[in-house]
Amino acid sequence: MSAPARPAPAAPIRVAAGTTAGQAVRDAGLPSRGAPDAVVVVQDPDGRLRDLSWVPDADVDVIPVTADTEDGRSVIRHSAAHVLAQAVQALFPDAKLGIGPPITDGFYYDFEVAEPFTPEDLEALEKRMRQIVKDGQLFSRRVFESKDEAREELANEPYKLELIDDKSGDLESSDEIMEIGGDELTAYDNLNPRTRERVWGDLCRGPHIPTTRYIPAFKLTRSSAAYWRGDQNNASLQRIYGTAWESQEALDRHLELIEEAQKRDHRKLGVELDLFSFPDELGSGLPVFHPKGGVVRRELEEYSRRKHIEAGYEFVNTPHITKEHLYITSGHLEWYADGMFPAMHIDAEYNDDGTVRKPGQDYYLKPMNCPMHHLIYRSRGRSYRELPLRLFEFGSVYRYEKSGVVHGLTRVRGMTQDDAHIYCTREEMRDELARLLQFVLDLLADYGLDDFYLELSTKDPDKFVGSDDMWEEATETLREVAESSGLHLVPDPGGAAFYGPKISVQVRDALGRNWQMSTIQLDFNMPDRFELEYTAADGTRKRPVLIHRALFGSIERFFGVLTEHYAGAFPAWLAPVQVVGIPVADDHIRYLDGLVAQLRALGIRAEVDTSDDRMAKKIVNHTNQKVPFMLLAGDRDVEAEAVSFRFGDRTQVNGVPREQAVAAIVDWVTRRENATPTAELVEISAETGEG
């Protein structure tokens, strides 16, 4: 179990007053341009990243930030975005600039251009970028004296002007804040290294690398349309994506990962394996599961259901819609309205003249299951003897996601959450959280996901309900439980929902990608809002502590993650078809029918391929369909009451006695092995030979 790989923190160095951070780096003999661990910026005592040209007013200790760290890569990528924008305006002089932030594993920049970018355009832009990098242009920070000065300089950049005008108001995202900054309004100029003349510039907070030569490896990956500021009511711009790394080797590894990820894309595999689809007639973000996908989903849910019963959970069911008042009580309409579908106004009655005889009511599709679970808790008096009370539901919820962010099964509008709410006393709280975290980790591991780290999301000071004392107690309790697990804990300041802090279980998949999976959220607020109580041992009425928990996040998302983790080759216990019988000729179908019937009677999902394809073609087809066990039968097999095993890795074991074959398959499936079965792994041996 591990956290994301990261280099060890560098030792502090002293920057003398009146000298640059870069000079201190050189004096310390630290790596410079060209090395993967070259220092690209420094971190000051307040945690702010500073250019190497930064000159402090007083002596100060700083942390060197190298190119092979996440912060270092982010700076390189931000600078690469500037190089891209310069290249675009050189080749497309009429292009207007949007924003260009670093993102996970890369960067993008938005442009207003007359026509969408083509693959040939991206090739030309890459070539121009390489020349800019080779030129070694200097990044130079400049502070505007006033907004008016900035407006005058950027008079021909309408999107930059909009950001300048919004500087004193609410910027929409951290990407925009990166453009504008906090206390000062600044630009970064690219200077000719010989003449120091300004070549190009952009409104930007920074920081940046010293020169363009600090970008050792980059590549433009694709382009797409994107709404300005993510709002579909705004102009549609053209976005170019790219990636940049500390070395060519790191870039090559990343591109290989992208290629493999494309092969594993669950949207592609969903079609190839006939698992699910997204009919246009239903709308964006609303998947349907086909029979094979339905089998996988059923197995996912059934195993989870069984483990929850063993862990003392009680199953409930709640409706898909509710009256408005429920979400007023819960606070969702105040804090989460943007994520809810519009109200349905129903039950109104009208007179013949159209006047209202009886007012209707607003109903909402539920975005969360928790308020309905609270009503179940509140439906009768509760005693401390009933606690902890663990309510669980596979509950359908509906959330409005903008069409631009909907993505396959991992970001949908209609989903099924494996949602649990645990009500306990404060005295039980810590033990229940520790028990719950271990349950989550164990269950995820049962599905083959066992590389974890934890993230602690704390209060957003601008978006929370409840007292500061409640939040502090909840946060510290979660922190103690997370730390006691022995897993690496990463802080997420301001990342909590409005009603309480949470632990997120982050999982690394087979490609080393991180996914947020399970969430455990402590909530002292909802019991007050719903007036939840229990009778304590001394006869007094007390509020229970509430713990929210979604283990898979949603069934749909978990399905998508597992599909990519296993590249569609689900473990045999989850596979939609576990065994396929392949006859050498039609004369052998009847024998395999009997074998398949025997397997089905033992709970194995098995079938016989009776198509007109030749045997070799059938093997290829079922290998591509990721069927874990292929059983071949010819004359010798029928005569000897045997079969030949064929596996996805093309290994084969011939002449396995029928009863031994059945026992081996049943044993493998019932043990819920997550490895792909091979001749080496499955305990079978041949006693006869088909040849």
From Swiss-Prot:
Segments crossing the lipid bilayer: none
Keyword Transferase recorded: no
SUPFAM superfamilies xref list: Class II aaRS ABD-related (SSF52954), Class II aaRS and biotin synthetases (SSF55681), ThrRS/AlaRS common domain (SSF55186)
Catalysed reactions, semicolon-separated: tRNA(Thr) + L-threonine + ATP = L-threonyl-tRNA(Thr) + AMP + diphosphate + H(+)
CC per GO annotation: cytoplasm
Cofactor(s), by name: Zn(2+)
Reported function: Catalyzes the attachment of threonine to tRNA(Thr) in a two-step reaction: L-threonine is first activated by ATP to form Thr-AMP and then transferred to the acceptor end of tRNA(Thr). Also edits incorrectly charged L-seryl-tRNA(Thr).
Cofactor note: Binds 1 zinc ion per subunit.
Keyword terms, alphabetized: Aminoacyl-tRNA synthetase, ATP-binding, Cytoplasm, Ligase, Metal-binding, Nucleotide-binding, Protein biosynthesis, RNA-binding, tRNA-binding, Zinc
Family note: Belongs to the class-II aminoacyl-tRNA synthetase family.
Class in the EC hierarchy, top level: ligase
UniProt-listed GO biological process terms: threonyl-tRNA aminoacylation
SUBUNIT field: Homodimer.
InterPro entries: aa-tRNA-synt_IIb, aa-tRNA-synth_II, aa-tRNA-synth_II/BPL/LPL, Anticodon-bd, Anticodon-bd_dom_sf, TGS, Thr-tRNA-ligase_IIa, Thr/Ala-tRNA-synth_IIc_edit
Binding site for Zn(2+): 370, 421, 548
Annotated EC: 6.1.1.3
Species of provenance: Mycolicibacterium vanbaalenii (strain DSM 7251 / JCM 13017 / BCRC 16820 / KCTC 9966 / NRRL B-24157 / PYR-1) (Mycobacterium vanbaalenii)
A Pfam family assignment: tRNA_SAD
SMART domains the UniProt entry points to: tRNA_SAD (SM00863)
Protein name stated in the entry: Threonine--tRNA ligase
